[in-house]
């Protein structure tokens, strides 16, 4: 329900996926939920790929995959919240494409949305973690608004529980072994 209300807003959608589970982190019918709002496609956890992987080819593969889901992003970024790769560029792109409006960060559970938001907040000079992060699905229970200014916010949305994600079928001990850190 919360995701579908974004279609009624005039905002930027920052769609975060996990590069190690691209298929499991795609949202079928995303366009239906977000309406005509522009989508900034953010592929997280790029630090876990070998440096020898051609980033341009990786980006092209991701964009082809997005197109299969009917997603035509205004831009695609390869980032790492954990290692702070491309975080400043992500903040610049969010500011460029949001045009003074709100930006909603959306994605399935465990793709690193809250970690990315914490790094973005740190990039603008704040210290500490504003948003709780966890390896367990569903940590963000409600929408969290972080003000950009007095008229607009960066909005962290709860992760969508996706049955195709393997993490929903693992015990705590197993999750620690398989979730990349």
Language model features: what each stretch is:
Residues 1-13, 37-40, 46, 131-181:
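Helix-rich effector regions associated with P-loop NTPase G domains
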Residues 113-114, 178:
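Short amphipathic alpha-helical patches
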Residues 18, 121, 158-159:
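Short glycine-/small-residue-rich Rossmann-like dinucleotide-binding loops
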Residues 40, 48-111, 118-134:
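Canonical P-loop GTPase G-domain recognition
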Residues 22, 83-86, 137-141:
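Short acidic loop-to-helix transition motifs that present clustered carboxylates
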Residues 2-75, 87, 150-151, 179-181:
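Conserved C-terminal guanine-recognition region of P-loop GTPase G domains, centered on the G4
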């Amino acid at each position: 329900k919360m995701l579908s209300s974004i279609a009624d807003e005039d905002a930027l959608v920052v769609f975060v996926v996990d590069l190690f589970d691209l298929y499991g982190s795609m949202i079928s019918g995303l366009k239906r939920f977000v309406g005509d709002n522009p989508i900034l496609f953010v592929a997280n956890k790029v630090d876990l790929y070998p440096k020898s992987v051609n980033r341009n080819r990786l980006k092209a593969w991701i964009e082809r995959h997005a197109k299969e889901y009917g997603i035509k992003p205004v831009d695609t970024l390869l980032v790492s919240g954990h290692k702070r790769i491309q975080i400043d560029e992500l903040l610049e792109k969010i500011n460029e494409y949001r045009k003074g409006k709100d930006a909603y960060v959306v994605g399935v559970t465990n793709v690193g949305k809250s970690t990315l938001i914490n790094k973005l907040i740190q990039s603008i000079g704040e210290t500490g973690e504003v948003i709780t992060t966890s390896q367990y699905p569903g940590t963000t229970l409600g929408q969290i608004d972080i003000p950009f200014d007095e008229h607009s916010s960066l909005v962290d949305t709860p992760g969508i529980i996706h049955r195709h994600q393997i993490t929903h079928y693992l015990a705590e001990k197993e999750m620690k072994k398989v979730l990349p850190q």
